[in-house]
Amino acid sequence: MFRGATLVNLDSKGRLSVPTRYREQLLENAVGQMVCTIDIHHPCLLLYPLPEWEIIEQKLSRLSSMNPVERRVQRLLLGHASECQMDGAGRLLIAPVLRQHAGLTKEVMLVGQFNKFELWDETTWHQQVKEDIDAEQLATGDLSERLQDLSL
């Protein structure tokens, strides 16, 4: 399980160094193999360990290619999916087209989200967090049933 937000830097080749606390888990569970794709709702990337991505692929394969909305989701997620292998120094090379999609340049937020990571441009991440907090403060009881059961 991945949690927390960590500032990491992209090097001149577009590689990011995976924080040490995640490396062993990624090597053990995915042999360092990852899949990166776009987030279809936010300007960030989704980074999955390969076994987790394979579960997503199975779900995507069950969508109908005859339904335009389902086909669009397949096209966006699968069409942008790029495999990346963690090297001996714990770095992952993020494809240029993906970096461009998310506006990643130097400072990147690696955000743990249970079974995957989100990759955000640092400035965009902080803006999104502010928007989310503001929206939550303005919310007036529109909690889903699952959120109503969440006790912190």
From Swiss-Prot:
Domain SpoVT-AbrB: 5-52, 81-124
Highest rank taxon of the organism: Bacteria
Subcellular location: Cytoplasm, Nucleoid
Any matching Pfam family: MraZ
Record Gene3D superfamilies: Transcriptional regulator MraZ domain
GO molecular function terms noted in the UniProt entry: DNA-binding transcription factor activity; transcription cis-regulatory region binding
GO biological process: negative regulation of DNA-templated transcription initiation
Alphabetical UniProt keywords: Cytoplasm, DNA-binding, Repeat, Repressor, Transcription, Transcription regulation
CDD domains with a match to the protein in the record: MraZ_C, MraZ_N
Main localisation: cytoplasm
Gene Ontology CC entries for this record: cytoplasm; nucleoid
UniProt function note: Negatively regulates its own expression and that of the subsequent genes in the proximal part of the division and cell wall (dcw) gene cluster. Acts by binding directly to DNA. May also regulate the expression of genes outside the dcw cluster.
Subunit structure: Forms oligomers.
Family (UniProt): Belongs to the MraZ family.
Name under which the protein is recorded: Transcriptional regulator MraZ
Species of the source: Shigella sonnei (strain Ss046)
